[in-house]
């Protein structure tokens, strides 16, 4: 007899996801079978792993396989496995909640646009819940491997807010997902349809997928293995089609979109391993959440060891999906052992170089690389600081907007070097809070006049990044808005002995480090310059957001003595009026940098007074 049935409510995020998913993914609904077979495959993988320490688990359940059962009379499709199974607590946790941080933020990003939402939901990973796209009711029967027959569990729900759980006897270990199909999904009871979907999405699954169909007028059941059941990464590259590579990517990533590119490589010699690495087309929603799971699927001698083996790639390549099969590693390897195990460090170094080579090759296709950079550019920039051994290779992958192509983040450092004048001995860049502030910065005026290209950096991590990238191919990187600028003869014409410089310095002594004449400017009256040892605004904000103490900065004010406004200031004798104009000059220089004046109310009062005098 079964124990008393208990009713539970879905976590709020699950109810929302189910509702959105059923409507957004209906046109791509066959993916439910891919998702459920992937889950069954994972369960078989985990059983084989547990059986390394407890071989009896395999002996009790037989060789792992996935079974599909069709019952046209009942209108049900069953996806069953004899894998690891679940306990009652695991059933409630796994089938009633979404244990991923950032879920609420992810759901808030869904727009109601069916096509866009389908991509986002696919990128999030729907897994088991995809069953409700085609089923009006879902029943799950499971027993954890090694548990007694009486400890089976039955879970059931119509996906409308609640589910029931009860303890039932179950002879078989593993899990069976029974889908009571909607009337408009009965085509998934057709043998031909099932073969087609398995062939498209799941042929590469490493365990047999067996279709069982009852025969009319015969008590026997027909069985048919639908997939090749071989580890795709162990096959020669020449025998694997692009469609198979893409299908396998979707299997391991649960992504709906094709990967941008991939690299399949087998290394033989003292250290043997096979890797299959993919670059996704879209960044996961939790890319910047430290606690998010990431890493490669690790196999040893084709035996699954763990998901999310993060020790094989550095943090800045955390978006890479794939498989690593290392037969020389011990089968009982742990995450702790992986961290300091010599062979793992060698594999990590080789895989890192392989990914960078893969991205370098992708960069030859401007259109595809633009897609990649829009999704993962900020993460690649982390590598400039984190991976000094590969810093120059990473720097070659960077892309920038420039003063000559301000609306396109597409210029590489190599392209910059190729187009610069022969006598230019450095790479100039400008930091700004926004792309608009960078494009309109007064600091660019003299560079435009002299035909010198400047990289425009407005990503919040850019200042931190260039702090580590001192040079590229032995050409120094120079901040166009820091320190004194030397572009040739004109820098010698700045007259810092002009009385106006002394008077402005006295008036603004509390607000600025110094006032000096400039050759940076052509059309603007003034600009702010950082001293050589001062933090820029991007770095200040990063430190403040992290709760770090930040020293107070006083900028240097550089003024254009040839500008009519500065020439007008020389004619003001009254100190109070001069001080107001000097303060406004500083305020407008701050605004031109995309910064707010220190005292906006005082700025407004001075502007009102100035406007009143002018009317």
Curated annotation (Swiss-Prot):
Family note: Belongs to the heat shock protein 90 family.
Complex formation: Homodimer.
Keywords: ATP-binding, Chaperone, Cytoplasm, Nucleotide-binding, Stress response
SMART domains the record matches: HATPase_c (SM00387)
Function: Molecular chaperone. Has ATPase activity.
Species assigned in the record: Alcanivorax borkumensis (strain ATCC 700651 / DSM 11573 / NCIMB 13689 / SK2)
GO cellular component terms attached to this protein's record: cytoplasm
Gene expressing this chain: htpG
Record-given protein name: Chaperone protein HtpG
Region called B, residue ranges: 336-541
Annotated region described as C, given as residue ranges: 542-615
Keyword NAD on entry: no
């Amino acid at each position: 007899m079964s124990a008393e049935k208990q009713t539970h409510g879905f976590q709020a995020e699950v109810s929302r996801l189910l509702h959105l998913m059923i409507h957004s993914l209906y046109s791509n609904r066959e993916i439910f079978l891919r998702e459920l077979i992937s889950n069954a495959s994972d369960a078989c993988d985990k059983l084989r792993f547990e059986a390394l320490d407890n071989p009896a688990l395999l002996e009790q359940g037989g060789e792992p396989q996935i079974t599909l059962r069709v019952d046209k009379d009942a209108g049900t499709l069953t996806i069953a496995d004899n894998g690891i199974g679940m306990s009652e607590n695991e059933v409630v946790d796994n089938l009633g909640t979404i244990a991923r941080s950032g879920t609420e933020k992810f759901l808030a990003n869904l727009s109601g646009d069916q096509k866009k939402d389908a991509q986002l939901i696919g990128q999030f990973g729907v897994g088991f819940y995809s069953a409700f796209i085609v089923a009006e009711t879902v029943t799950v029967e499971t027993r954890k491997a090694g548990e007694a027959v009486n400890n089976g569990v039955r879970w059931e729900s119509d996906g409308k807010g609640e589910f029931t759980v009860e303890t039932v006897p179950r002879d078989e270990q593993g899990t069976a997902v029974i889908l009571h199909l909607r009337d408009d999904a009965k085509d998934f009871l057709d043998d031909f349809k099932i073969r087609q979907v398995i062939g498209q999405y799941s042929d590469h699954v490493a365990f047999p997928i067996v279709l069982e169909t009852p025969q009319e007028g015969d008590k026997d059941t027909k069985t048919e293995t639908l997939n090749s059941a071989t580890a795709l990464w162990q096959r020669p590259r020449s025998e694997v089609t692009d469609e198979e590579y893409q299908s396998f990517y979707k299997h391991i990533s649960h992504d709906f979109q094709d990967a941008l590119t991939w690299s399949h490589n087998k290394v033989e010699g003292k250290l043997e391993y096979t890797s299959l690495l993919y670059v996704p087309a879209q960044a996961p929603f939790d890319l910047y959440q430290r606690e998010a799971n990431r890493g490669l699927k690790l196999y040893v001698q084709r035996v699954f060891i763990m998901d999310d083996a993060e020790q094989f790639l550095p943090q800045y390549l955390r978006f890479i999906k794939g498989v690593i099969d290392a037969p020389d590693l011990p089968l009982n390897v742990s995450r702790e052992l992986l961290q300091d195990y010599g062979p793992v460090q060698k594999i990590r170094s080789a895989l890192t170089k392989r990914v960078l080579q893969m991205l370098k090759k992708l960069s030859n296709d401007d259109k595809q690389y633009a897609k990649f950079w829009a999704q993962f550019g900020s993460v690649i920039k982390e590598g400039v600081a984190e991976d000094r051994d590969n810093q120059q290779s990473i720097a070659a992958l960077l892309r920038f907007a420039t003063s000559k192509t301000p609306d396109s983040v597409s210029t590489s450092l190599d392209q910059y070097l190729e187009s610069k004048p022969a006598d230019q001995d450095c790479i100039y860049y400008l930091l700004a809070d926004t792309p608009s502030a960078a494009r309109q910065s007064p600091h660019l005026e003299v560079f435009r006049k002299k035909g010198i290209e400047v990289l425009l950096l407005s990503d919040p991590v850019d200042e931190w990044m260039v702090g580590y990238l001192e040079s590229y191919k032995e050409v120094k990187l120079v901040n166009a808005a820091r320190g004194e600028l030397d572009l040739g003869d004109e820098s010698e014409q700045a007259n810092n002995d002009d009385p106006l410089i002394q008077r402005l310095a006295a008036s603004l002594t509390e607000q600025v480090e110094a006032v000096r004449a400039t050759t940076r400017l052509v059309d603007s009256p003034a600009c702010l310059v950082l001293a050589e040892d001062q933090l820029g605004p991007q770095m200040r904000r990063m430190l403040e957001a992290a709760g770090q103490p930040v020293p107070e900065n006083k900028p240097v004010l550089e003024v254009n003595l040839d500008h009519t406004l500065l020439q007008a200031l020389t004619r003001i004798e009254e100190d109070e009026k001069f001080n107001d104009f000097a303060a406004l000059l500083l305020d407008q220089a701050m605004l031109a940098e995309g910064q707010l004046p220190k005292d906006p109310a005082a700025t407004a009062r001075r502007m009102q007074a100035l406007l009143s005098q002018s009317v």
